[in-house]
Amino acid sequence: MSKKQFITRWDDEQLAEANRSLAAVTGKSNLHKKDRLFPSSPFGQTAAGLEDFRGVELTETIQYLTVQGVDLSYARFVGAASLNTSTFTNCCFDRIKLDSRYVTHEFSRCSFRGAKLNNARISERFEDCDFTGSNLSKAIANDVSFIRCRFSDVNFRGAMFMHCRFEECSFEGAVFHNGSLAGSRFTGETGLLPVWGNTILDGVKINGERLV
């Protein structure tokens, strides 16, 4: 199916129910509830066994939840909705639109291929995540850990990734320019490091050695 088909398959009633169900479990006001599970999709599961929310439009922030095995590819977040202070494992956010929004807390084995994350506010830990082809221009991250993440062909123009830790990450084809990596640390194969471009590199260390 195409992006348009994933989006248009959702009718108004299905979207309203998805957001009602999410509102019942997300946020601080629902922390007292037991079994705060991410809603089930009216479309069942994908071929990969993930809960199928591809193309959904969410008006509710996914907040203070533990989410596993959900596919939110092509999802759109409207209003103030974002991914905020939650734990995501084995989730798919391919080509998701999260520009100028929060993408925070912990992400493990998640895919952000082709995602629009420009101007996003990013934290706190990403492990075994794939950002191939995503737009991270002007994104802001401070003291964030990226473990074994793939950043192939990522647009980092104007991004401010300061005091971050990149462990065994790859950056083939990634573009940095007019941003900052000040105070960040890189460990792993030096052949997998990015082309820095006109990027602030004050205090950057590679395998323990100061770069500039």
Report each predicted region and the residues it spans.
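N-terminal, intrinsically disordered, low-complexity segments
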Residues: 2-27
